[in-house]
């Protein structure tokens, strides 16, 4: 009994590790939805003060956080299963539970299915059964395709895995927008898509930036295996690529904030991100691929900071001053 109990406990630990729940990475998948929910709620409170409460907005943001977190866990399992033969050859990934044989394929797939179904149920609850397929199917498809985009065949199509990852992490901005229903509940889906577009572009470009820097740590092994990736293509121009991506991110943030008309957001979001990006680009060293790791962590901190900025914007009633 003791031996079986020890195995059960170890399996639970390995499954948590498989979904990266022991690390901060899945939290990156929660930012776009949480930001979008809070800012949509802030906008609604500003223009219709009695239509919704801050408590309701924050409860919807929490649901969006949980949905995104759990869905990301399922995506991590799928990625490791498809990339199993690659992970076993890369120094940074060969210790993952599937790669080292700590979790069987059957166990991993059951765990993945449980997380996916849970996230679908939570999204349905949050959206009160409306637009659930529109919220879940596109991001599910991009998650399925993501690991395959690392194959050389996708290079011929000029499709890189960062594109699909960016789409996957940015798409919850639509879910967050849908979570705050407009007055009269009459807004069509296309209008919600249009409303969420600036946030989508912000998170999409931000993901390209931070993932390119982070994944550059594997550039030596990936070049040997001819892995399809933007940082492999960039080669010695990796620093130039990061500068271009940083400019695109800040431009997208400006687009998002232009519609918010908030001095607080301009200072707390745009100001802090601009200063941070300048420091990151100075510290990144293409001759030391490992320098991309700290940059990735700093961007996670920016994501957490921006949640705080959005919450303050909500609590001050969207006045931004």
From Swiss-Prot:
The chain crosses the membrane at residues 26-46, 57-77, 107-127, 132-149, 159-179, 189-209, 232-252, 262-282, 300-320. This is Polyprenyl transferase cle5. Gene3D superfamilies: UbiA prenyltransferase (1.20.120.1780). Disulfide bonds: none annotated. It comes from Aspergillus versicolor. It is an enzyme of class 2 (transferase). Coiled coil: none annotated. Belongs to the UbiA prenyltransferase family. Its EC number is 2.5.1.-. One of its GO terms (cellular component) is plasma membrane. GO terms for biological process: terpenoid biosynthetic process. Keywords: Membrane, Transferase, Transmembrane, Transmembrane helix. CDD domains: PT_UbiA_COQ2. Polyprenyl transferase; part of the cluster A that mediates the biosynthesis of chevalone E and its oxidized derivatives that possess a unique five-membered lactone ring and can synergistically enhance the cytotoxicity of doxorubicin (DOX) in breast cancer cells. Pathway: Secondary metabolite biosynthesis; terpenoid biosynthesis. The gene is cle5. PROSITE patterns: UBIA. Its cofactor is Mg(2+).
């Amino acid at each position: 009994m003791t031996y079986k109990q020890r195995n059960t406990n170890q399996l639970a630990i390995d499954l948590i590790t498989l979904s990266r729940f022991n690390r901060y990475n899945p939290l990156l998948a929660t930012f776009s939805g949480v930001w979008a929910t809070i800012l949509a709620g802030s906008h609604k409170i500003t223009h219709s003060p009695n239509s919704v409460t801050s408590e309701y907005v924050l409860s919807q943001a929490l649901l969006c956080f949980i949905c995104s977190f759990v869905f990301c866990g399922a995506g991590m399992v799928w990625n490791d299963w498809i990339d199993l033969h690659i992970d076993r050859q890369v120094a940074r990934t060969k210790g993952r539970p599937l790669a080292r044989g700590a979790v069987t394929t059957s166990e991993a797939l059951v765990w993945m299915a449980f997380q996916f179904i849970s996230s679908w149920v939570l999204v349905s609850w949050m959206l009160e059964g409306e637009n659930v397929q529109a919220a879940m199917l596109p991001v599910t498809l991009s998650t399925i395709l993501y690991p395959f985009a690392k194959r050389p065949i996708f290079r011929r199509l000029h499709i890189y895995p960062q594109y699909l990852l960016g789409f996957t992490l940015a798409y919850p901005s639509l879910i967050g927008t849908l979570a705050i229903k407009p007055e009269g509940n009459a807004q069509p889906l296309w209008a919600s898509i249009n409303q969420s577009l600036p946030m989508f572009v912000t998170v999409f470009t931000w993901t390209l930036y931070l993932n390119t820097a982070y994944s550059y740590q594997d550039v030596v092994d990936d070049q040997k295996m001819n892995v399809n990736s933007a940082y492999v293509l960039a080669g010695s121009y990796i620093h130039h690529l990061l500068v271009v991506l940083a400019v695109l991110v800040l431009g997208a943030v400006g687009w998002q904030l232009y519609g918010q008309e908030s001095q607080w957001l301009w200072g707390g979001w745009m100001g802090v991100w601009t200063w941070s990006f300048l420091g990151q680009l100075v510290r990144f060293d293409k001759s030391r691929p490992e320098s991309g790791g700290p940059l990735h962590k700093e961007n996670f901190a920016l994501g957490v900071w921006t949640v705080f900025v959005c919450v303050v914007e909500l609590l001050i009633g969207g006045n931004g001053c």
